[in-house]
């Protein structure tokens, strides 16, 4: 089934891309959700007419994503957690915790943009992949330190 994407979907393509998907996926998900339209002759002609506008929008989104990626690379992310003497954490650091730490430094991201295969369970420096846009990602080192308790 040939469709034209109305918005960027990370697994399929960018807005305005002509894609070929299985009929069930297109009919049951993409079309009802308004994420795509059928690639009829009139829709393809409309796409070609709006191509310059779509390309400008994509360029703007990419520029914003690259600025955020540069800002993330310059950041020093330190998260304090309760830890035992052996360096293991009581609990773990998840992508939600990383998202909250970034929000404290005025970088607002969705927790789904932070790719963390497993929660961090030890005091360590761990590289974490953050997807800030379509095919724009950066790696941030998250330093987990023991919470300093003052008696």
Swiss-Prot record:
GO biological process assignments: translation
Entry superkingdom: Bacteria
Annotated Gene Ontology cellular component terms: ribonucleoprotein complex; ribosome
Pfam families: Ribosomal_L9_C, Ribosomal_L9_N
Keywords (A to Z) from UniProt: Ribonucleoprotein, Ribosomal protein, RNA-binding, rRNA-binding
MF annotations from Gene Ontology: rRNA binding; structural constituent of ribosome
SUPFAM superfamilies from the UniProt entry: L9 N-domain-like (SSF55658), Ribosomal protein L9 C-domain (SSF55653)
Transport is among the record's keywords: no
PANTHER family: 50S RIBOSOMAL PROTEIN L9
UniProt family annotation: Belongs to the bacterial ribosomal protein bL9 family.
Function (record text): Binds to the 23S rRNA.
Protein name: Large ribosomal subunit protein bL9
């Amino acid at each position: 089934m040939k469709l034209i994407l109305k918005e960027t979907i990370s697994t399929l393509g960018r807005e305005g891309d002509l894609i070929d998907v299985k009929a069930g996926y297109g009919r049951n998900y993409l079309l009802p959700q308004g994420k795509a339209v059928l690639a009829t002759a009139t829709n393809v002609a409309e796409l070609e007419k709006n191509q310059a506008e779509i390309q400008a929008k994509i360029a703007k989104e990419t520029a914003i994503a690259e600025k955020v990626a540069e800002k993330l690379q310059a950041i020093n992310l330190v998260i304090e957690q309760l830890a035992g003497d052996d360096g293991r954490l009581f609990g773990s650091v998840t992508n939600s915790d990383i998202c909250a730490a970034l929000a404290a430094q005025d970088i607002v991201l969705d927790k789904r943009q932070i790719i963390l295969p497993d929660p961090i369970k030890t005091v360590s420096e761990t590289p974490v992949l953050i997807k800030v846009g379509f095919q724009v990602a950066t790696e941030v080192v998250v330093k987990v330190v023991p919470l300093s308790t003052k008696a």
